[in-house]
Amino acid sequence: MAGPVKDREAFQRLSFLYQAAHCVLSQNPENQALARFYCHTEKTIAKRLVLRQDPSVKRTLCRSCSSLLIPGLTCTQRQRRRKGQRWTVQTCLTCQRSQRFLNDPKHLLWGDRPEAQLENQADINPSEPLPNIADLPKENIQTQALNTSE
């Protein structure tokens, strides 16, 4: 289980703004300006406090106009093939900016990989300990530097 989260109130505020933008668009799809304001405020708070947002949240926000991207309502979503790979192309209907996302079932985001978790990084031990440079004569230090650079 994860430990206590730093800036818990800030993450709760970001979550509230994101949910409020979804609520506004679901109740009244014409009120995109208010939803855009909520999303822009969310991005500003996250940037000011240097907080990392989940990639799934960032993918649902337009990078230029801060609109909430909901397929069929505020954006179009198409499947394309390019150079043998499948891509999902989202185009914002407000500013016409498009984003491409790799559509590969085998692809894992870095945050979802096991080696990205802090618990797993602490368990990894180097195969052999590094020598203490203060204990070695200068000739050995130079030869070790040459061996490691090769």
From Swiss-Prot:
Q: Which Pfam families match?
A: Rpr2
User: In the record, which residues are listed under signal peptide?
Assistant: none
Look up keyword Metal-binding and say if it applies: yes
**To which protein family does this belong?**
Belongs to the eukaryotic/archaeal RNase P protein component 4 family.
- Which GO terms are recorded in the biological process aspect for this UniProt protein? response to xenobiotic stimulus; tRNA 5'-leader removal
Q: Enumerate the subcellular locations listed in this protein's record, separating them with semicolons.
A: Nucleus, Nucleolus
Q: Where is this region: Disordered?
A: 121-150
Ordered alphabetically, the record's keywords are: Acetylation, Metal-binding, Nucleus, tRNA processing, Zinc
Q: What is this protein called?
A: Ribonuclease P protein subunit p21
